[in-house]
């Protein structure tokens, strides 16, 4: 399981060192895809297969499901670590992570239990600024009271 967060810097070739705490939890090959909140998601092959199987269980006649699968599958890349323990983030994923802002070099790796989220620094910090103890409490109440 992967927890915590770390800020790292991309080099000029969009390579970034995977934090050791995360690298030790993920087994290659790795799959990098777009996430649902403007981040990218990095999964082990096992976790990516589980994620894909979940999507495959949905109604194939539903246009929204087909569009989700199309976007996920067309924006997924198999990633390997180089000898220095770095991954290269493809240009399309960089555009997704930095959508609506200038391409930057600071990236947050965020543990999401079964996978790692990759965020632009500004988006992740803006997201965290919105969460207060009271706001989180209300969000939890709403989520657990939904049917």
From Swiss-Prot:
<protein>
    <recommendedName>
        <fullName>Transcriptional regulator MraZ</fullName>
    </recommendedName>
</protein>
<dbReference type="InterPro" id="IPR037914">
    <property type="entry name" value="SpoVT-AbrB_sf"/>
</dbReference>
<dbReference type="GO" id="GO:0005737">
    <property type="term" value="C:cytoplasm"/>
</dbReference>
<keyword id="KW-0963">Cytoplasm</keyword>
<dbReference type="Pfam" id="PF02381">
    <property type="entry name" value="MraZ"/>
</dbReference>
<feature type="domain" description="SpoVT-AbrB 2">
    <location>
        <begin position="76"/>
        <end position="123"/>
    </location>
</feature>
<dbReference type="GO" id="GO:0009295">
    <property type="term" value="C:nucleoid"/>
</dbReference>
<keyword id="KW-0238">DNA-binding</keyword>
<keyword id="KW-0677">Repeat</keyword>
<dbReference type="InterPro" id="IPR038619">
    <property type="entry name" value="MraZ_sf"/>
</dbReference>
<dbReference type="InterPro" id="IPR007159">
    <property type="entry name" value="SpoVT-AbrB_dom"/>
</dbReference>
<comment type="similarity">
    <text>Belongs to the MraZ family.</text>
</comment>
<comment type="subunit">
    <text>Forms oligomers.</text>
</comment>
<dbReference type="InterPro" id="IPR035642">
    <property type="entry name" value="MraZ_N"/>
</dbReference>
<dbReference type="GO" id="GO:2000143">
    <property type="term" value="P:negative regulation of DNA-templated transcription initiation"/>
</dbReference>
<feature type="domain" description="SpoVT-AbrB 1">
    <location>
        <begin position="5"/>
        <end position="47"/>
    </location>
</feature>
<dbReference type="InterPro" id="IPR003444">
    <property type="entry name" value="MraZ"/>
</dbReference>
<dbReference type="InterPro" id="IPR035644">
    <property type="entry name" value="MraZ_C"/>
</dbReference>
<keyword id="KW-0804">Transcription</keyword>
<dbReference type="GO" id="GO:0003700">
    <property type="term" value="F:DNA-binding transcription factor activity"/>
</dbReference>
<dbReference type="GO" id="GO:0000976">
    <property type="term" value="F:transcription cis-regulatory region binding"/>
</dbReference>
<dbReference type="InterPro" id="IPR020603">
    <property type="entry name" value="MraZ_dom"/>
</dbReference>
<keyword id="KW-0805">Transcription regulation</keyword>
């Amino acid at each position: 399981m992967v927890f915590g967060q770390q800020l790292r810097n991309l080099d000029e070739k969009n390579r970034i060192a995977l934090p050791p705490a995360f690298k030790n939890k993920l087994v290659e090959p790795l799959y990098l895809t777009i996430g649902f909140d403007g981040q990218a998601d990095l999964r082990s092959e096992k976790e990516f297969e589980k994620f894909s199987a979940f999507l495959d269980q949905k109604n194939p006649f539903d246009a929204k499901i087909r569009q989700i699968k199309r976007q996920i599958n067309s924006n997924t890349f198999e990633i390997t670590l180089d000898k220095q323990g770095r991954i290269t983030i493809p240009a399309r994923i960089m555009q997704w992570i930095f959508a609506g802002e200038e391409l930057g070099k600071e990236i947050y790796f965020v543990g999401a239990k079964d996978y790692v989220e990759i965020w632009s620094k500004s988006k992740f910090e803006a997201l965290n600024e919105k969460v207060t103890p009271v706001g989180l409490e209300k969000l939890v109440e709403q989520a657990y009271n939904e049917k």
